[in-house]
Each structure stands twice: as structure tokens, then as C-alpha cells.
């Protein structure tokens, strides 16, 4: 997932403890995104299993990755990397294989959301929450029928009005799809072509925002741009007339996944927590709290029909098929990030 606004579940955090202070079998160190666990949920897990959860949070895949690289002695037992970071960490030997025979609730997951390129057969990751980046349109100000493609954002009529996410891979993926390329390309020439295309877009860009991209729409600062579908849902719940348009070139799909670090000390406990989080009642509670789609079909069946049948949250199969899941691009990530910083600096 991306950066988010901040709230912490009261009572769920036990910070500042030395890893060696607790019995490994009765203590689980869970490192997760901010806003990703409903209040009281981990206490419920502890009550049911006797396993105490030491919970801490991060705001980017990069900070989670750096922490795991720094701590070599098994500081965490369960983490939640996004799509292409699963592939990166798997390829670097940072994750261990997951024994799915210990996950009785694995069958609740949507088969269409399994076996993605970033982790074939889900050997190293289990879907937790998923989402997509598409086009957000304030329908009180802009006719959504006139915005059907990523390419429409380049129209001169939208000068100094667009919001883009502050995410190199997403912004470049938009341009790459516009040009007919894969958003996961490692080809330097294609990445450079996307950069040149984005330079043409910059006169239309008002702001980059990945802290909470729904807020500028809610506050009336922008009416058009890139937007995560979960952020759009939250904004609509607050009364903002915000539509999600699935671009004809394809949306950008991502997934946040439960994974066990290679040096985790409490593998058995991690498997128990994963299985707990895959329970229909638990997964439904998570989805309702954070406002993003659940990959759990049994949980989706428990959601209010207005949520479960919302095509902006749960896009039709043809929309998903047309879109593209983010994957690791290896060393090409340096070129993406370098050019993205140049783009924002006006160079």
C-alpha cells in the first residue's frame, strides 16, 4: 500500500521492547502498515491463542525493507509487503516459504487474486488487502463521461488542476500504459519515453500526494487526477461526489500481503495469525475498517451489499483483466526514481 494519514489502534501497540525480552513461542512481532488493523483485533487474537502481539507500523515499503535489512536477528515474525516488494524480498532471500497446509482458511481467498506474477503459487505471500489506482473525478465539477483514458489527463483544458500520486512506479506506469508499454518494463528506452511523456503532462499537474490523496478532493483543491479506489470510497462516505474511472489503457493494481521473514523466530505463531486474519469475520472487519477491498470471498459475502457490490471497490473481471499488477523491476527501479525526482524538480 501507500503512505496514509495517521491513527493508531489504542491498546494494540507495545513499543520499545527488546526482542529478547519475551518467550518467542508466546510472543509475535507484527510489522504492518499504519491503519491496517482494527482496534481490538489483536487483543482478540491474544485472547483466543494466548500469543501476545508486539505491534509496530511503517508508512512505506522502503522503510519496512530497510528495517528488515538492518535487523539480522529475527526482529519480526510477520510483515505486510506490497506487490513488487514481495518479489524483491523473495528474490533476495528475505522471506521464507509459507506452509499453506497450516492455513485452514486459505480456501476463503478469491482464486482470481492468487498466483500473481510477483509470487507464483503464493509460496511466500498471502493476500491481505488489495486495491487499484485509477482516475478520480469530482462529478460536480467535471463530466466523468469525458474522462475515459489516462491520455485524457494530458488535455490542455486541465492545466494546473491534476493530482498525481507521489509514487514513481505508479506515475510512470500511467505514462507507460498510455504509450502501450508494460508498467513493469525494465527497458531503459521505454522508461525514458515515459519520462518525456510525463514532462508534457507537468503543466497540468497541481500537486503530488501520497499521504492521503483523497483529502485534496474532499477539500475542493482538485477535481481530477490519479486516485486509489479505497481513498475514493472513503471520500464518498464523507459526502464528496467522487467517481472512479477505470482507464481504457488499464488500471494499476496492487496487493498488500502477509509474509514471514526468513529469520522470523515465531513461525508457528505467524501462521496462526495469518489463519486468524483469513477468517471471514475477521477479514470483513478489516475491510470495513480501512475501506479497501478484501481478497477474501467469504469475508466479502459478510459485507453490506452497498460495499460488496460497489464496482469502484470491487471492479468487474474485465477491468481487472485489462489492468496490470505491479511487479519488481530490479535495478531499473533506480532509473524510475531518478527520473521521477527530475520530473518533480522541473528538469
State where each predicted segment sits:
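Extracytoplasmic ligand-binding site segments that recognize negatively charged/polar headgroups
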Residues: 75-76, 80-86, 90-221
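Bacterial N-terminal signal peptides that target proteins for export
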Residues: 1-8
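Periplasmic-binding protein-like
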Residues: 192-200, 236-262
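A ligand-binding cleft/hinge motif common to bilobed small-molecule-binding domains
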Residues: 85-88, 218, 223-241
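Mature extracytoplasmic/periplasmic domains
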Residues: 261-321
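A bilobed periplasmic-binding-protein/Venus flytrap-type ligand-binding module shared by bacterial periplasmic
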Residues: 134-141, 177-178, 255-267, 285
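Early extracytoplasmic/lumenal segment of secretory-pathway proteins
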Residues: 22-88
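Conserved C-terminal helix/tail region of periplasmic/extracytoplasmic solute-binding proteins
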Residues: 317-347
Amino acid at each position: 500500500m501507500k503512505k496514509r494519514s495517521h491513527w493508531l489502534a489504542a491498546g494494540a501497540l507495545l513499543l520499545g521492547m527488546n526482542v529478547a525480552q519475551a518467550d518467542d513461542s508466546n510472543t509475535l512481532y507484527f510489522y504492518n502498515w499504519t491503519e491496517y488493523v482494527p482496534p481490538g483485533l489483536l487483543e482478540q487474537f491474544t485472547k483466543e491463542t494466548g500469543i501476545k502481539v508486539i505491534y509496530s507500523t511503517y508508512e512505506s515499503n522502503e522503510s519496512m525493507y530497510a528495517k528488515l535489512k538492518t535487523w539480522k536477528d529475527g526482529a519480526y515474525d510477520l510483515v505486510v509487503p506490497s506487490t513488487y516488494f514481495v518479489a524483491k524480498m523473495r528474490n533476495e532471500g528475505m522471506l521464507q516459504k509459507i506452509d499453506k497446509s497450516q492455513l485452514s482458511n486459505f480456501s476463503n481467498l478469491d482464486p482470481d487474486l492468487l498466483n500473481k506474477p510477483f509470487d507464483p503459487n503464493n509460496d511466500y505471500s498471502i493476500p491481505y488487502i488489495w486495491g487499484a489506482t485509477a482516475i478520480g473525478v469530482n462529478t460536480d465539477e467535471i463530466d466523468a463521461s469525458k474522462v475515459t483514458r489516462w491520455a485524457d489527463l494530458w488535455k490542455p483544458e486541465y492545466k494546473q488542476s491534476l493530482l498525481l500520486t507521489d509514487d514513481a512506479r505508479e506515475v510512470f506506469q500511467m505514462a507507460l500504459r498510455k504509450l502501450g508499454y508494460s508498467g513493469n518494463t525494465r527497458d531503459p528506452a521505454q522508461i525514458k519515453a515515459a519520462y518525456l511523456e510525463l514532462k508534457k503532462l507537468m503543466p497540468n499537474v497541481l500537486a503530488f500526494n501520497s499521504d492521503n490523496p483523497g483529502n485534496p478532493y474532499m477539500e475542493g483543491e482538485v477535481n481530477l487526477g490519479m486516485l486509489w479506489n479505497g481513498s475514493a470510497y472513503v471520500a464518498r462516505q464523507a459526502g464528496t461526489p467522487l467517481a472512479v474511472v477505470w482507464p481504457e489503457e488499464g488500471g494499476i493494481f496492487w496487493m498488500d500481503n502477509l509474509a514471514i521473514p526468513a529469520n522470523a523466530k515465531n513461525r508457528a505463531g505467524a501462521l496462526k495469525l495469518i489463519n486468524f486474519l483469513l477468517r471471514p469475520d475477521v477479514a470483513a472487519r478489516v475491510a470495513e475498517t480501512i475501506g479497501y477491498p478484501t481478497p477474501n470471498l467469504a469475508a466479502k459475502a459478510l459485507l453490506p451489499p452497498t460495499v460488496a457490490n460497489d464496482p469502484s471497490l470491487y471492479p468487474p473481471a474485465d477491468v481487472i483483466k485489462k489492468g496490470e499488477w505491479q511487479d519488481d523491476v530490479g535495478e531499473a527501479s533506480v532509473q524510475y526514481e531518478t527520473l521521477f525526482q527530475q520530473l518533480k524538480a522541473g528538469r
